[in-house]
């Protein structure tokens, strides 16, 4: 610690920014030292300091009372009567705090009132969040029965206590303490999951076909729809109305959603082409993208299709080829390797 020694020797003549104290006490000889009075409460700490003997540790600096009335502000550790109360009478306010851990009586009263208020608030919160003690937990935590289940006794004890942690409020998810927010929230109250409507009775296949006023895209007695196996991949009504995946995607999505919502069919089943028909049509498309009427009639007779089916298949196949060419062009132009 030679820095402090150097500071003490040259502090009166020069300014040293690296020193803690560079003002000589001889410059202020007329002013009394503010640390002249003895320490009233010395704070000691269990750990030892490793500093030099002439350097005072920071944690052991005495806390002095500057301008405070000792009788008015008793210390916390001085619950021994007149020594902390101040004066020779020994009956100051500090002497009355000995029974309350060193606090004055008004401090003890305030602390007791605060503790009572906190205990009352905690008890109110527990009453609001916890279920009443008189109810059975199987009534509170009863699991919802499945929609299609037959009425009868519950299957096993799983429905008795499915959730043992908190009572479920009216919203079905959060505890009962959150019901106040749902009461103040705008909009209709939470109604819970609604059971799906019962499905309509399925109609027989023959009645659905006869009752449909429209004929399919492959209409005609000699259509191969009757020959197609049900396990074959459906590609659209003769791929003429839907094409080989060429119909607009919005229309296909609407058809899927309508078929999912309404259980009864409002149109005939979209029958796919057989592999033989697709192979012959693709072979003709490879040689002639646009087919003339004679070749179209010849194909329709050979494949047992209608003239309209062959015409619409070629239209959709041209649109598919156009899309494939566009995607191919984007791939090759966007790829820096080509």
Swiss-Prot record:
A Gene Ontology molecular function term of the record: DNA-binding transcription factor activity, RNA polymerase II-specific
GO biological process, any: dorsal/ventral pattern formation
Chief site of localization: nucleus
Compartments where located: Nucleus
DNA-binding region: 266-325
Record-level GO cellular component terms: chromatin; nucleoplasm; nucleus
SMART domains: HOX
Source taxon at top rank: Eukaryota
Gene3D superfamilies xrefs: Homeodomain-like (1.10.10.60)
Acetylation listed as a keyword: no
InterPro entries: DUF3528 (IPR021918), HD (IPR001356), HD_metazoa (IPR020479), Homeobox_CS (IPR017970), Homeodomain-like_sf (IPR009057)
Ranges of compositional bias, category Pro residues: 186-204
Region Disordered, residue ranges: 179-270
Keywords: Developmental protein, DNA-binding, Homeobox, Nucleus, Transcription, Transcription regulation
Family: Belongs to the Abd-B homeobox family.
Name of the protein: Homeobox protein Hox-D11
Source organism per UniProt: Homo sapiens
Gene, per the UniProt record: HOXD11
């Amino acid at each position: 610690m030679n820095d402090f020694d150097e500071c003490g020797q040259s502090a009166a003549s020069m300014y040293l920014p690296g020193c803690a104290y560079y003002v000589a006490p001889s410059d202020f000889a007329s002013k009394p030292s503010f640390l002249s009075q003895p320490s009233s409460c010395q704070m000691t700490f269990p750990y030892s300091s490793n500093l030099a003997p002439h350097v005072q540790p920071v944690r052991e600096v005495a806390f002095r009372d500057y301008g405070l009335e000792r009788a008015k502000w008793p210390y916390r550790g001085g619950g021994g009567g007149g020594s902390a109360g101040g004066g020779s009478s020994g009956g100051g306010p500090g002497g009355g705090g000995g029974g309350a851990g060193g606090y004055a009586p008004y401090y003890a009263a305030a602390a007791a009132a605060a503790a009572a208020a906190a205990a009352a608030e905690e008890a109110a919160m527990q009453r609001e969040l916890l279920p009443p003690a008189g109810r059975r937990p199987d009534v509170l935590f009863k699991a919802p029965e499945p929609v299609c289940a037959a009425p009868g006794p519950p299957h096993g004890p799983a429905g008795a206590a499915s959730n043992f942690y908190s009572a479920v409020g009216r919203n079905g998810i959060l505890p009962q303490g959150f019901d106040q927010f749902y009461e103040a929230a705008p909009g209709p109250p939470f109604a819970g999951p609604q059971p799906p409507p019962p499905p309509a009775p399925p109609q027989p296949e023959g009645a659905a076909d006869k009752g449909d006023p429209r004929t399919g895209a492959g209409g005609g007695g000699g259509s191969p729809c009757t020959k197609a196996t049900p396990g074959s991949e459906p590609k659209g009504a003769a791929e003429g109305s839907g094409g080989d995946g060429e119909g607009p995607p919005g229309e296909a999505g609407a058809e899927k959603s309508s078929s999912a919502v309404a259980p009864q069919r409002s149109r005939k089943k979209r029958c796919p082409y057989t592999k033989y028909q697709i192979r012959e049509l693709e072979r003709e498309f490879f040689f002639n993208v646009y087919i003339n009427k004679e070749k179209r009639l010849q194909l329709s007779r050979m494949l047992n299709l209608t003239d309209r089916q062959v015409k619409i298949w070629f239209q959709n196949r041209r649109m598919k080829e156009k899309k494939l060419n566009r995607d191919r062009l984007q791939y090759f132009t966007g790829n820096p390797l080509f």
